[in-house]
From Swiss-Prot:
Its cofactor is Zn(2+). The keyword Ribosomal protein applies. Part of the 50S ribosomal subunit. This is Large ribosomal subunit protein bL31. Binds 1 zinc ion per subunit. InterPro entries: Ribosomal_bL28/bL31-like_sf, Ribosomal_bL31, Ribosomal_bL31_A, Ribosomal_bL31_sf. The keyword Iron does not apply. GO terms for molecular function: metal ion binding; rRNA binding; structural constituent of ribosome. The gene is rpmE. It comes from Salinispora tropica (strain ATCC BAA-916 / DSM 44818 / JCM 13857 / NBRC 105044 / CNB-440). Keywords: Metal-binding, Ribonucleoprotein, Ribosomal protein, RNA-binding, rRNA-binding, Zinc. One of its GO terms (cellular component) is ribonucleoprotein complex. GO terms for biological process: translation.
């Protein structure tokens, strides 16, 4: 095996945009990683799921293209 073929595996601080931080090990250089979501703020882990208003989106679509159909019918 070649010497020095594996990257250095160091302790790394992970910081989330919500303010949560934790320590893990990684090959990332610099010793710190910044993430947008983590298990403390992600809806899957917290149980706070957002409901998308799909009915409103469909109504907007139909309203938008009803105008096009009205023009074609003239």
């Amino acid at each position: 095996m070649k010497p020095n073929s594996h990257p250095e595996y160091v302790t790394t601080e992970v910081a989330c945009s919500c303010g949560n931080t934790f320590t893990t090990r990684s090959t990332a250089k610099g010793g710190s990683i910044h993430v947008e979501t983590c298990s403390a703020c992600h809806p899957f882990y917290t149980g706070k799921q957002r409901v998308l208003d799909t009915a409103g989106r469909v109504a907007k679509f139909q309203q938008k293209y009803a105008k096009v159909q009205a023009k074609k019918g003239k």
